[in-house]
Amino acid sequence: MIKSLNKYLLVMIILACSSGGSSPTDSGDDNGNGDNTNPYELPNAVDYGLSNQVEIVTWNIRQFPQHSSTKDYVKNLMEKWDADIYFLQEMRSESELISMVNSMPNYSYVFDEESGNLGFALVYKNQYVTFNSKNELWADTPNNDDGDSDYANNASYQFADRPPMENYVTWSDGVKTINLYLIGIHYKCCGDDSYDAN
């Protein structure tokens, strides 16, 4: 019980503390040094190759896709990292992500349903990960108006209008199996009067 709680807390801390910086997804024609290096070589992206451990990447991808080259850039980076699970924030276009993931063999995806145009996506490697279920925490918390014109169900999570996305998955490498609850929290970066009150 304590080990499970420790794993759960570790995953929560990792997801909560992930960087929310902008994504350098406009590759342009060169790397800015004038040497026309392939922008998708990604020399600083590391595949740790840890076959006996769960590899999770969280990424505020910043309004995916931002540019015409975003899908190719992100796909190349994810393939280079070769992680088991990617928890992405600010998915502006589900269809673009679906197209990208469908071009990546052995990966699947799950989207949230309550975050609107800047939602969550869970992308995972089928070889190691089994998706069991998802839950959008506090998505049914009442609010005056959540902006969806459905006044019978004004259910806007009070924190930045983005309910945390909880996913229950099972990771297995054939030797060991780990059940994980992954919770993505998309913090609001900038305040205003209405958000500051919450």
Located regions from the model:
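Divalent cation-coordinating acidic motifs and surrounding scaffolds
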Residues: P24-N198
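Sec-dependent signal peptide recognition
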Residues: K3-V11
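C-terminal motif of bacterial Sec signal peptides marking the signal peptidase cleavage site
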Residues: L15-S18
